[in-house]
A protein has these predicted regions:
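Catalytic core of non-heme Fe(II) oxygenases with the double-stranded beta-helix
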Residues: 2-8, 12-106, 110-126, 130-141
Length: 145
């Protein structure tokens, strides 16, 4: 199987598991979507500052990660406190997901995330992607159906 096929299968299982009709992103899920992907190669001392994406759902597949000398070094962090902006609801705790080769992590594209700094002298290689609806009429995931 190609990485795209594995990713689409994983996304399908993710949707089946989480589509309980309560979440707008799943209620308005497009019949067809594109995967817009890129690879990221980082060396010792690397980090990626907090950011969001323009897709509906984003993901990262970890190819190679350095052996960790520090607990969270090189891991991915999700938080609503990424910038100096007011937080209306503070019921989403900071969450750190450990990276390991072969792990695929999916998350809403609008959720701020970053790569925590690492200093190990090894490469960190990942493949990131956004899921973008293929449609002439795009309904934002937060809009009512």
């Amino acid at each position: 199987m190609t990485l795209e096929q594995v990713t689409r299968r994983y996304v399908g299982k993710f949707l089946q598991k989480h589509n309980n009709g309560q979440n707008q992103i799943f209620r308005n899920w497009p019949a067809e979507y594109a995967l817009d992907g890129w690879y990221i190669k980082m060396l010792s001392g690397g980090d990626i500052t907090a950011h969001v994406h323009q897709g509906w759902l984003s993901g990262t597949f970890y190819v190679r990660v350095p052996a960790k000398k520090e607990n969270d070094a090189g891991n991915i962090e999700f938080t609503l406190h990424a910038w100096d902006l007011p937080v209306v609801r503070d019921d989403f705790p900071r969450r750190i997901v450990a990276t390991k080769p072969g792990r695929l992590v999916l998350f809403p594209s609008s959720l701020p995330h970053r790569v925590l700094p690492f200093s190990e002298g090894q490469e960190r290689i990942s493949i990131a992607f956004d899921i973008i609806p293929k449609s002439n009429q795009v309904v934002p995931p937060q809009a009512p159906a």
